[in-house]
Each structure stands twice: as C-alpha cells, then as structure tokens.
C-alpha cells in the first residue's frame, strides 16, 4: 500500500515539477526503489534495513528504538 502511495505522489510531482528540477525527480525514483525493497522484507529484516540506512546516512552507528521481537 505504501508503495502505491509513493508512486502516485511521484507521478503528481513529475507532472507539476519542470524537468530542470531533475533532483526532485531523482529523489522520488530513489524513494520508490527504497519503499519497494522495504515492503519485500519481513519484520526482523525491516528493523535491520532502517538501522543500516540511518547509520549509512548519518555516518555513525545508529540504534533504532524499535525492537521487533
């Protein structure tokens, strides 16, 4: 469901935003890919996915507060 919402928002943005703002288009393409990969994971893999993503973005070892048992 989340994937469909992101795709719909991306389509609206592609229509409204001119092509010279290519970074906005690229951002939504990356978001579609991330949401697609996230929805394919199970509960424990989702925890590790966000832990790895946040530590990669920040450059530090980030512990997510959600402990999925």
Swiss-Prot record:
GO terms for cellular component: host cell membrane; membrane. Coiled coil: none annotated. It is a single-pass membrane protein. Glycans are attached at residue 51. The chain crosses the membrane at residues 16-36. The keyword Cell inner membrane does not apply. Keywords: Glycoprotein, Host membrane, Membrane, Transmembrane, Transmembrane helix. Residues 1-15 are cytoplasmic. It is found in: Host membrane. Its main location: host cell. The keyword Zinc does not apply. Residues 37-69 are extracellular. Belongs to the asfivirus X69R family. This is Uncharacterized membrane protein X69R. It comes from African swine fever virus (isolate Tick/South Africa/Pretoriuskop Pr4/1996) (ASFV). The lineage of its organism: Viruses, Varidnaviria, Bamfordvirae, Nucleocytoviricota, Pokkesviricetes.
């Amino acid at each position: 469901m989340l994937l469909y919402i992101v795709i719909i928002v991306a389509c609206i943005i592609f229509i409204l935003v001119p092509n010279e703002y290519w970074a906005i288009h690229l951002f939504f393409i990356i978001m579609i890919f991330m949401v697609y990969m996230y929805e394919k994971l199970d509960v424990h893999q989702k925890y590790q996915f966000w832990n790895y993503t946040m530590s990669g973005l920040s450059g530090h070892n980030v512990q997510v507060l959600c402990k999925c048992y």
